[in-house]
């Protein structure tokens, strides 16, 4: 993924909510922390939830799994509804912004946008593009890039230098047409994780998150945030 490189975003609801506000999203939906994966802690997350973002480490084990998963889907096929908004990632460290775009784009009907919203404009202009075209469009979309850069400096930890290699990655988990989709711009296509509903999205998404953790039991660097009705 040579070429453009952005500063990474934190998996921090304050940062993501401020970022989306600056892009013209009305705060009727807000990101909140998911403090744990067990039912008691999940019950603390305000409902309804329309998306979950997972931050996880890219490890050797994960990369082996990713390659195997891709080959399996290419040989066996999978059902993916044409309603899914999916884009590729061509900008290093832009996975946080792409995760947010995936979360909002696939819940656009639930969202309220301020007049002149940059994000609404981007989504409307890219709606009929291919995943690759959307990636290239983002590369040249200065209004989002500048807002991302500002937000990357607003986290609780100091932003790394632009050249520092970052091995943490964001994906979005969303409900589209009755199915749970994993949207990861590093992958060639969305991953269909089976049936879900608006009511069970959080629990179903967390089951997928648990599989990421089980694949790397020695890793602690996992963080999930949920997009909840405010």
Swiss-Prot record:
Spans annotated as Interaction with ubiquitin. Crossover loop which restricts access of large ubiquitin adducts to the active site: 152-159
Protein name per UniProt: Ubiquitin carboxyl-terminal hydrolase isozyme L3
Keywords: Cytoplasm, Hydrolase, Phosphoprotein, Protease, Thiol protease, Ubl conjugation pathway
Site, as annotated: Important for enzyme activity: 184
Localisation: Cytoplasm
Name of the gene: UCHL3
Parts of the chain that traverse the membrane: none
Expression by tissue: Highly expressed in heart, skeletal muscle, and testis.
Activity regulation text: Inhibited by monoubiquitin and diubiquitin.
The UCH catalytic domain, residue ranges: 5-229
Pfam assignment, any one: Peptidase_C12
GO cellular component, one term: cytoplasm
Protein task: Deubiquitinating enzyme (DUB) that controls levels of cellular ubiquitin through processing of ubiquitin precursors and ubiquitinated proteins. Thiol protease that recognizes and hydrolyzes a peptide bond at the C-terminal glycine of either ubiquitin or NEDD8. Has a 10-fold preference for Arg and Lys at position P3'', and exhibits a preference towards 'Lys-48'-linked ubiquitin chains. Deubiquitinates ENAC in apical compartments, thereby regulating apical membrane recycling.
Active site location: 95, 169
Molecular functions per Gene Ontology: cysteine-type deubiquitinase activity; deNEDDylase activity; peptidase activity; ubiquitin binding
Annotated positions for site Transition state stabilizer: 89
